[in-house]
């Protein structure tokens, strides 16, 4: 895994962030914000899997059908980590699909707790006090 960020990577990250703003538009009681999360993965998958349509469908549907719910302000952190793992998997086949799913699932709870406590409780009280 390299630490350098290319211009193409910056474009993908920017597009993924913009798509992530639509995440709450696709709320479903069973999978919560999974479809919006899959849309945030789309810019990277479009570039890395453009020549492999079957793998593209499989990867996109995996993200669209797995439960996803976290604090909206912390969501780009989870998306960025999963996007980096998907890039490694698509380009080098060095990351397993189950690893990506388990990392995504294990980051949901802590980021929700941090985001809810900081942005919805502490920050609101501090700003209201000022």
Report each predicted region and the residues it spans.
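Soluble N-terminal domains of membrane-associated systems
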Residues: 1-96
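Transmembrane alpha-helical segments and their cytosolic interface motifs
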Residues: 98-130
